[in-house]
Amino acid sequence: MRIVLITGISGSGKSVALNALEDAGYYCVDNLPPHVLPELARYLAEEGQHRLAVAIDARSSASLDEMPGLIRALSLEHDVRVLFLNASTQSLIQRFSETRRRHPLSGSPSHDANVGLLSSLEEAIERERELVAPLAEFGHQIDTSTLRANVLRTWVKRFIEQKNNDLMVMFESFGFKRGVPLDADLMFDVRALPNPYYDHELRPLTGLDQPVIAFLDALPIVHQMIDDIHAFLMKWLPHFREDNRSYLTVAIGCTGGQHRSVFIAETLAARLAHDANVIVRHRDAPVDVDASSRLVADVHRP
């Protein structure tokens, strides 16, 4: 059976992700007490159901300590995937304000006896981060701070489509001017490379457009940067595998996240496609989420 566990911070999109999995044919349960999960999996398997999705959050705080061991045990018999959704505190506060929803931990006792009850939304968010932090290392993290609901649904579907027999590597392009991604395991700064933004014809385009690809592909320094990052990844990916890592997010950042980082993320993904399961996300580029074109896969080094 394939089991998808959705966890993370309240307000980061767990309900959206669970709905996407339900549309994909998964049997979905929200806020299931973790200790019930093995029994539910056995029951559904006997009933002929082979796909289960469960959302787990801080409302199950009494059982969260059991989750690491439970995930390991379930993985012995099932294809278990963990999706950890995160977002910046500012984004979460804005979402709770707009929806007028109450945070699950608002009004709950603080772990600090001198504080009493958690009175502010920010306190509740930070307390939840502490509670669910141990689960982050088991899952593929997605920073939803800037994601629209339809984009998140698409990424969840891509996540479950990936083969689970090897390390999954996500290449994520981003712009430093919009902040660094919360879900990055490795981060590379490519702002030292020539910027297509200063060419007025290239400015409105992205690193997925052929004129920008041609501009960057003609520069030896760009290929030197790509070669160095590729060599680093090829050296260290075996060590991530030995550490039993299932997911690795490699963030590539330029100033605006539109040209250089997009091109390099796509090029690196094409190079590593034979060595790992790869997916590409362009956080800040104005591109269709389904337009992760493989134009750069056909680029040949000079």
From Swiss-Prot:
GO terms for molecular function: ATP binding; GTP binding. Keywords: ATP-binding, GTP-binding, Nucleotide-binding. Pfam families: PapZ_C, RapZ-like_N. InterPro entries: P-loop_NTPase, RapZ-like, RapZ-like_N, RapZ_C. It comes from the Bacteria. ATP binds at G8, I9, S10, G11, S12, G13, K14, S15. GTP binds at D57, A58, R59, S60. Belongs to the RapZ-like family. Displays ATPase and GTPase activities. PANTHER family: RNASE ADAPTER PROTEIN RAPZ. This is Nucleotide-binding protein Bcep1808_2900. It comes from Burkholderia vietnamiensis (strain G4 / LMG 22486) (Burkholderia cepacia (strain R1808)).
